[in-house]
């Protein structure tokens, strides 16, 4: 999927961040940095108006995270290529260099996990929005065959996992060998004992890093489409009615909530 070329409107970006905040009420995997980690700080914000009042504070958060993941994958890809060239000119990489290889491959694992975490979170966005707003639930996506974003993110994740598994299988390796930090280190220690093992690890890592760069481009395109759809919904007449109703409900409830270190947030309309 190509990267969406048009820049989202300010309202579209705002709607996306509101959706991310809404998704914080659903379970999410722990992902370092990024959207899922920050969203968990707002799990107390069950009121729709409070959630919307935080819109715009982190408008580019999702795209920035995807960019960072993609850049790290590309850096790892380039570094592993350097190690491959070094290995071609020597019998075996010395221990201190192999230690750097192990660190890069562990970082590559984190790249995969963070990408999966973003897809999981953004899939939750649509589900939660449909639960909160009937007008959003009635909107049709602009995806092929009218597929939901939630299902499309699941398909993206499944394809990513299958591609990695296929790459490992081609090298007579399995996903189970790299399913945890402990098993990964054990596998890498075993592969480090020979020049052939080192080269195999470098080639597989290089392939997976290249795949992640391509997968992040697809994920960015999917997020861009979702932002566009949410911007369209946010600007619709029915959405404004839904949000106005949420404001009235909060006004008559007369309640306030402390947010993030005691700072009181009030909706601004």
UniProtKB/Swiss-Prot annotation:
InterPro entries registered for this protein in UniProt: T4SS_TrbJ
Keyword Signal tagged: yes
SUPFAM superfamilies: Typo IV secretion system protein TraC
Keyword Signal: yes
Signal peptide: 1-32
Keywords (A to Z) from UniProt: Conjugation, Plasmid, Signal
NCBIfam families tied to this protein: PRK13842.1, TrbJ_Ti
Gene: trbJ
This protein's name: Conjugal transfer protein TrbJ
């Amino acid at each position: 999927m190509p990267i969406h070329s048009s820049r989202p409107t300010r309202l579209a970006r705002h709607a996306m961040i509101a959706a991310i905040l809404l998704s914080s009420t659903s379970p999410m995997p722990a992902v370092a940095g990024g959207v899922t980690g920050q969203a968990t700080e707002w799990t107390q914000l069950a009121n729709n108006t409070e959630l919307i009042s935080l819109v715009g504070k982190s408008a580019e958060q999702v795209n920035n995270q995807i960019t960072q993941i993609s850049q790290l994958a590309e850096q790892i890809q380039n570094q592993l290529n350097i190690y491959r060239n070094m290995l071609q000119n020597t019998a075996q990489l010395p221990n201190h260099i192999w230690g750097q290889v192990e660190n890069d491959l562990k970082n590559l694992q984190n790249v995969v996990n963070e990408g999966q975490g973003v897809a999981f979170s953004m899939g939750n966005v649509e589900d939660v929005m449909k639960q909160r707003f009937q007008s959003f639930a009635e909107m049709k996506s602009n995806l092929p065959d009218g597929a939901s974003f939630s299902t499309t993110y699941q398909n993206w994740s499944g394809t990513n996992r299958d591609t990695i598994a296929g790459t490992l299988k081609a090298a007579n390796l399995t996903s189970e060998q790299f399913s945890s930090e402990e098993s990964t280190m054990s596998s890498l220690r075993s592969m480090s004992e020979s020049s052939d093992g080192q080269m195999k690890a470098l080639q597989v890592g290089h392939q997976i890093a290249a795949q992640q760069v391509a997968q992040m481009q697809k994920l960015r395109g999917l997020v861009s489409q979702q932002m566009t759809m949410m911007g369209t919904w946010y600007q619709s007449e029915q959405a404004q009615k839904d949000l106005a109703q949420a404001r009235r409900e909060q006004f008559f409830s007369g309640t306030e909530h402390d947010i993030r270190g005691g700072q009181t947030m009030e909706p601004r309309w």
